[in-house]
C-alpha cells in the first residue's frame, strides 16, 4: 500500500472545518515545576531544583481535549474527577477554556489524578504521581451513561482516552461504543489497558503503543514482521478495527488488513520529550476521520503531529496552520513560529536573555549572514522578526523579492538563529512588548538615527546593541 500523495493530504487537511468531537476519558491535572539546577544537595546525592515557575494544565484525556480545541474542533468533554482541590482545579481550567462541564462528574471516593513533573532545562528530574488505589473501579456510572446517550447524536466522532485509572468501567465503555455504533459515529480508542481489549470491541480505530500492543497480544514487537503479526491479532479481537500502532522511534503502523498496511517512518530529529505524542496522534486521527479523510491520510498527518510534539519539552498543542506549514516546508519550519507560540515557549525556558533583531531581510546576502552570525556573541536565545509581505508592500510600495515564508525558511536554516517570526504590523513594537527582549540588535547606522521602536525599548528596559556588518 502506497503512502498518500501530498496534494491529497493537503486537500483533506484544508477541507476540515470544525467537527464536533466528544472526548470520554481519564481527566488528570499536569503540574510542571520549572527551575534550574546549580548544586547538589548536602543532605543526599541529589540535585537541588531552584524553582522559577509553576504551571498547571489539563492532562490525560484533558490533553486530547486541548489538542482538539487548538486544532479548531468543537469539543465536548466527559469524565470523572474527585471532589478535591485537584478536581476543582480541573473544573476551573475547563471553564476558563470555555468548555461545558456538564459531562464531568465529581465523586467523593475518588482522588483526582495528578502528575507533577519537575524539570530543569530539557531534563525531567522527577515525576510525582497522585493516583487512585490499585484496582479502583467506578461503579455508579448510570448518570454518566445517560448523559452520553443524550449528547452523542450531535457528535461526529467519539474519542475514548483510557488511562486505566478506574474511571471508565468496562460496561460503560462497551455501552458507549454500542450507542455510537447505532448512530454510525466513528469511535477512536487510545488504550492504556494492558490486558482485556475485548471491552473495546466495536471501535472503529484503536491506537496502542508498542508496549500496550505487545501486552494485549503476547508478542514481543521487535521489527515490522512482529508489528504486523500483533496488529493482525488485535484486529481479529476487535472485529476489524483499524489499527494505528505507535512504534516510537520506528514511526507508526497503519494496519487495515494483511494486504493493506503502511509503515510511516519518523524524521531523524532531536527528541526532547515523548510526553503527549500519543495524545497528539489520537487527536489528529479523530479530527480527520470525523471529517471524512481516508485512513492513510489521517495516519500520515497524525504521525507528522507526533514528530512535532516530541521536539518540545512538556505537552504542546498545535494550531492547524502550524502543522500545515511543517508538512509544506519541512522540519526547518519548527523554528518559524507565531508570536503566541513563541510567548508560550519562552515562558518555559530558562533565564537565558532573549536577543532580537528585526527587519525586511529581503534580498538576503553575505552581509546579512555576517550580521546574523554575530548574534551568538550575546549568549542568549536569538529571535529574528521579519516584516510580512503585506507590511513590506505598505512601507516600500512594492512586494519583496522573496515571499515571507522563503525569507523565514532561509533565516531558520542558520545556526545562529533560534526562532523566526513574521509580523504583520509596520513596526516591531508589539513584538517587543510581548517578548520583552533583554537585547535589541540593530545595524551600526542606527547609532545616529531614530529607532522606530525606541519608546517601547525604553519601556521594557531592553538595551540596544549595534553591529557593524550590516544596517537593516
What are these regions (language model features)?
Residues 2-6, 12, 21, 29-159, ...:
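Conserved N-terminal subdomain of the carbohydrate kinase-like
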Residues 24, 49-58, 166-167, 356-368:
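Short, glycine-rich nucleotide/cofactor-binding loops
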Residues 53-56, 184-198, 460-472:
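Short, flexible loop segments at boundaries between secondary-structure elements
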Residues 57-71, 177, 365-380:
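Histidine-anchored nucleotide/phosphate-binding helix
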Residues 76-81, 187-191, 208, 383-387, ...:
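Short internal beta-strands
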Residues 166-261:
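Conserved phosphate/ATP/ADP-binding segment of small-molecule kinases
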Residues 241, 267-326:
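Conserved post-catalytic alpha-helical subdomain immediately downstream of the catalytic base
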Residues 320, 328-472:
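Nucleotidyltransferase catalytic core that binds NTPs
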Amino acid at each position: 500500500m502506497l503512502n498518500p500523495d501530498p496534494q491529497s493530504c493537503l486537500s483533506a487537511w484544508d477541507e476540515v472545518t470544525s467537527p464536533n468531537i466528544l472526548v470520554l476519558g481519564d481527566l488528570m491535572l499536569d503540574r510542571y515545576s520549572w527551575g534550574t539546577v546549580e548544586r547538589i544537595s548536602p543532605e543526599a546525592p541529589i540535585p537541588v531544583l531552584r524553582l522559577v515557575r509553576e504551571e498547571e494544565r489539563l492532562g490525560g484525556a484533558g490533553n486530547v481535549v486541548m489538542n482538539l480545541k487548538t486544532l479548531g474542533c468543537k469539543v465536548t468533554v466527559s469524565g470523572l474527577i474527585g471532589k478535591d482541590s485537584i478536581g476543582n482545579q480541573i473544573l476551573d481550567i475547563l471553564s476558563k477554556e470555555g468548555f461545558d462541564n456538564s459531562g464531568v462528574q465529581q465523586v467523593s471516593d475518588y482522588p483526582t489524578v495528578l502528575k507533577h513533573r519537575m524539570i530543569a532545562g530539557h531534563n525531567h528530574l522527577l515525576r510525582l504521581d497522585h493516583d487512585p488505589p490499585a484496582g479502583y473501579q467506578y461503579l455508579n456510572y448510570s448518570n454518566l451513561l445517560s448523559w452520553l446517550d443524550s449528547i452523542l447524536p450531535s457528535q461526529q466522532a467519539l474519542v475514548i482516552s483510557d488511562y486505566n485509572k478506574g474511571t471508565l468501567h468496562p460496561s460503560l465503555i462497551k455501552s458507549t461504543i454500542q450507542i455510537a455504533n447505532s448512530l454510525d459515529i466513528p469511535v477512536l480508542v487510545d488504550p492504556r489497558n494492558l490486558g482485556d481489549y475485548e471491552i473495546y470491541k466495536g471501535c472503529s480505530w484503536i491506537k496502542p503503543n508498542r508496549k500496550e500492543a505487545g501486552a494485549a497480544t503476547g508478542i514481543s514487537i521487535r521489527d515490522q514482521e512482529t508489528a504486523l503479526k500483533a496488529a493482525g491479532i488485535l484486529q481479529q479481537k476487535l472485529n476489524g478495527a483499524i489499527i494505528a500502532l505507535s512504534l516510537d522511534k520506528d514511526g507508526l503502523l497503519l494496519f487495515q488488513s494483511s494486504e493493506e498496511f503502511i509503515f510511516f517512518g519518523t524524521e531523524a530529529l532531536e527528541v526532547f520529550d515523548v510526553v503527549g505524542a500519543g495524545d497528539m496522534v489520537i487527536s489528529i486521527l479523530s479530527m480527520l476521520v470525523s471529517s471524512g479523510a481516508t485512513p492513510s491520510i489521517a495516519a500520515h498527518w497524525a504521525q507528522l503531529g507526533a514528530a512535532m510534539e516530541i521536539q518540545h519539552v512538556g505537552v504542546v498543542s498545535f494550531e492547524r496552520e502550524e502543522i500545515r506549514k511543517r508538512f509544506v516546508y519541512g522540519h526547518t519550519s519548527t523554528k518559524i513560529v507565531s508570536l503566541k507560540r513563541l510567548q508560550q515557549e519562552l515562558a518555559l525556558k530558562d533565564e537565558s536573555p532573549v536577543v532580537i533583531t528585526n527587519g525586511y531581510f529581503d534580498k538576503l546576502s553575505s552581509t546579512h549572514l555576517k550580521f546574523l552570525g554575530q548574534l551568538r556573541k550575546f549568549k542568549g536565545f536569538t529571535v529574528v522578526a521579519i516584516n510580512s509581505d503585506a507590511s513590506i508592500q505598505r512601507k516600500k510600495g512594492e512586494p519583496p523579492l522573496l515571499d515571507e515564508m522563503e525569507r523565514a525558511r532561509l533565516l531558520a536554516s542558520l545556526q545562529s538563529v533560534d526562532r523566526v517570526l513574521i509580523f504583520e504590523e509596520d513596526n516591531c513594537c508589539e513584538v517587543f512588548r510581548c517578548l520583552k527582549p533583554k537585547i535589541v540588535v540593530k545595524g551600526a547606522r542606527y547609532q545616529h538615527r531614530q529607532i522606530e521602536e525606541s519608546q517601547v525599548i525604553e519601556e521594557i528596559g531592553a538595551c540596544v546593541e549595534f553591529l557593524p556588518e550590516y544596517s537593516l
